[in-house]
Curated annotation (Swiss-Prot):
It is found in: Cytoplasm. InterPro entries: Amidohydro-rel, Metal-dep_hydrolase_composite, Metal_Hydrolase, Urease_alpha_N_dom, Urease_alpha_subunit, Urease_AS, Urease_asu, Urease_asu_c. The keyword Cell wall biogenesis/degradation does not apply. PROSITE patterns: UREASE_1, UREASE_2, UREASE_3. It comes from Burkholderia pseudomallei (strain 1710b). This is Urease subunit alpha. The modification N6-carboxylysine is found at K214. The lineage of its organism: Bacteria, Pseudomonadati, Pseudomonadota, Betaproteobacteria, Burkholderiales. Binds 2 nickel ions per subunit. Its cofactor is Ni cation. Residues 126-564 form the Urease domain. Its EC number is 3.5.1.5. Pfam families: Amidohydro_1, Urease_alpha. The keyword Metal-binding applies. PANTHER family: UREASE.
Amino acid sequence: MSRRAYAEMYGPTTGDRIRLADTELLIEVERDHTLYGEEVKFGGGKVIRDGMGQSQLPAADVADTVITNAVILDHWGIVKADIAIKHGRIAAIGKAGNPDIQPGVTIAIGAATEIIAGEGLIVTAGGIDTHIHFISPQQIDEALASGVTTMIGGGTGPATGTNATTCTPGPWHMERMLQAADGWPINLGFLGKGNASRPQPLVEQIEAGAIGLKLHEDWGTTPAAIDNCLTVADDTDTQVAIHTDTLNEAGFVEATVAAFKGRTIHTYHTEGAGGGHAPDILKVCGEANVLPSSTNPTRPYTINTLDEHLDMLMVCHHLDPSIAEDLAFAESRIRRETIAAEDILHDLGALSMLSSDSQAMGRVGEVIIRTWQTAHKMKVQRGALTGDGARNDNFRAKRYVAKYTINPALTHGIAHEVGSIEPGKWADLVLWEPAFFGVKPAMIVKGGMIAVAQMGDPNASIPTPQPVHYREMFATRGGALARTSLTFVSQLALDAGIGARYGLAKRLVPVRGCRTVTKRDMIHNAWQPAIRVDPETYDVVADGALLTCEPAAVLPMAQRYFLF
């Protein structure tokens, strides 16, 4: 059987390479967990039939769902395998079949097992977006259809404060937003407002259910507020996210770093166009206690990046272009040199995460697209990374997928539940046809059940006739919704019984380990360079090397995928 024939029947195997969408990125299958000649496949005349690939074992001893012959792309590897799901969690990665007659079976299929055909598909962990302004609930539909299954941030709707800052302020708003979370088929976690100089206003938000606190310059990110916020976070094992002081009113970047006192913190849009000490906030990604992320409008650097940012900034931060001071504030944040350096710092693993900044200088449905566009641009401009060769870009792929899966999960204390494809974790999985990888998922599985899929005319005789578009599936309806999605809260809130007190239906999961995670824990993205930004030219130097690149004029994963 030729390699081509085998791939067409069972999907790629060890040594086969796959192009990701229309990029220059190639991944190569490193290992195949299935056994040649013993593969399982569903369909007429195929293997998964009673007494053949399907066993006589009862429901307790077989998988609820098996994704067959899929290529898994995760931070830990690129492998071909069958994926077992049981009780909404990933149960095993291995070889599925009938253990009574087949060798090497680690996943038993029975009459209780549903099959999702993974032949020829790539499976990734559900994306995690940690910079969400909850301005409109319709963001969730867009995010889920893009492959994001967890959203972390703050807000209360299109209030002026939420339009600018990712904060759900105070216990009353926190309770209302946690109640609203019950209506959406996605994992959610909310950040309280961290700008206060005394502990009580912050502690009461954690007790109300916040998984962390957000410091934002629009509320006054002073050294006193930073110190107090981090002290409360240390006491409650929650994370702090920060948007630093663009105007340098309360101090320069050195004063902010000093206020951290070596404590863990997540820096949003660390390049600075989204906000932060001008012009050198980028320096903080060399700190051991700083977990740096980007937001997607600057990803990657293109010929249009600078032009679109000014108007975005004026709207999002309630500025008036007719006021000279407001205009100067906006222009101070937009620097071609630091945006160009941001591309390279991502490629070298100094910037650890990527998120959206939804409707507040960011696009909620483009986290995954822009991550892979950045990876493509860097391969074209900088060549292979150390660890990759001429045949594949496996290490680069692992580095970039980690930026929106495992690293944000580690940062916000939810990696024990989500963020990777590993046994025991919540079965949030995204299935992609390689030609549409990173752009348009074929199917999104939430908590082991199909939540969203590309589906044709419901009145047609088969599932595929046009119009084919994303439609919500049964995991988004009735009681299934609350049993296939999670709401993350603080341990303090869980112990206080907010689930019963608020009347919540979703399972509440406490965050943990938020205060012990450091930059060295950021998988494939742990580089800590010494960075200097020239205050006059804005040139960025990391460990003595000037970081600069040209803007892209054309990108993959763009217009050809969005004709309609």
